[in-house]
Amino acid sequence: MSNKLCQLCNERRPALVRPKTGQKICKECFYYVFETEIHNVIIENKLFVRGERVGIGASGGKDSTVLAYVMKLLNERYDYGLELYLISVDEGIRGYRDDSLDTVKRNQQQYGLPMKIVSYADLYDGWTMDNVVARIGTKNNCTYCGVFRRQALDRAALSLDIHHLVTGHNADDIAETILMNLLRGDVARLPRSTEITTQSDSSPTKRSKPFKYSYEKEIVLYAHYKKLDYFSTECTYSPEAFRGTARAMIKQLENIRPSSILDIIYSGESMQLASSVQEQLPQQTTCERCGFISSNRICKACMLLEGLNKGITGLGLGSDRKTKKLQSQIPACAE
């Protein structure tokens, strides 16, 4: 076998070194193994049911753009029989989200998929992330955005009678989350952070991660070679410092041992919670104010909104004891 030919087909010249395996392969073989591995993950985990409506969380970034492209491709190639929709959230970040939404709109035309866009301003008393950051600064802004975004996706999905969302979380993201939970000693969150599909009894939608075992570098390479239209600028408001530290550690490990990302995921999957720890997890119910999932009487989104509207920064960000005390002072119905 010539070392100048693709190590998989032995016919074409290699175009890249595959990050996950170190193999020198051609573009055609890379497309095939990348797409086939995702298909196998979908089938082995029985992610979808024929005839199901599935919402694709679309931000315009590389992960969600490749996800939309691959989901459409595999749905047609293997006849999954799914109804696919793009769902996007406008957080209200001028100079970032407005530009990325333009990318999502182009993707909608390119892929021919129906699309739904919801905004923080419409859902949360006129609050945008620009307004939130102007009020609280950048210390906890990612917490606000994460809580609001999750509920916004739920609301958009329900408006389309969708009860299953797929997101572009990749292997790197999951490995980072596992590492963060371990460093915090938060083992109770390990099962949820490693599951490919998550849903609680009272959640309106379940969420799946078809890219659970897909490396970020390979997603970037796929988008590059396929010439996909995506928005590459990072969020204006810097990511959470702790996650950034975990990300740097993951990258260092990957440089030394490419399999480290999957090794961390497999390790997280193998860790089992003791029954005593499981019993300590909060029981999930629905928020008395907005009706969405919550482990408390008032959900975190409503708590955060209450703080913003009353000028009490940090409301809903403290310890469970402090949060529950504050919740007892909040009426179930908005004033």
From Swiss-Prot:
E.C. code: 2.7.7.-
GO cellular component: a single term: cytosol
Principal location listed in the UniProt entry: cytoplasm
GO MF annotations in UniProt: ATP binding; nucleotidyltransferase activity; tRNA binding
PROSITE patterns in UniProt: UPF0021
EC class (word): transferase
Pathway recorded for this protein: tRNA modification; 5-methoxycarbonylmethyl-2-thiouridine-tRNA biosynthesis
InterPro entries: CTU1-like_ATP-bd (IPR056369), CTU1_C (IPR032442), Ncs6/Tuc1/Ctu1 (IPR000541), Rossmann-like_a/b/a_fold (IPR014729), TilS/TtcA_N (IPR011063), tRNA_thiolation_TtcA_Ctu1 (IPR035107), UPF0021_CS (IPR020554)
Superkingdom assignment: Eukaryota
Keywords linked to the UniProt accession: Cytoplasm, RNA-binding, Transferase, tRNA processing, tRNA-binding
Pfam families to which the protein is assigned, alphabetical: ATP_bind_3, zn-ribbon_14
One example of a Gene Ontology biological process annotation: tRNA wobble position uridine thiolation
Subcellular location: Cytoplasm
Residues that span the membrane, as ranges: none
Keyword Transferase carried by entry: yes
Quaternary assembly: Interacts with ctu2.
Described function: Plays a central role in 2-thiolation of mcm(5)S(2)U at tRNA wobble positions of tRNA(Lys), tRNA(Glu) and tRNA(Gln). Directly binds tRNAs and probably acts by catalyzing adenylation of tRNAs, an intermediate required for 2-thiolation. It is unclear whether it acts as a sulfurtransferase that transfers sulfur from thiocarboxylated urm1 onto the uridine of tRNAs at wobble position. Prior mcm(5) tRNA modification by the elongator complex is required for 2-thiolation. May also be involved in protein urmylation.
Family designation: Belongs to the TtcA family. CTU1/NCS6/ATPBD3 subfamily.
Name of the molecule in the record: Cytoplasmic tRNA 2-thiolation protein 1
Species classification: Eukaryota, Fungi, Dikarya, Ascomycota, Taphrinomycotina
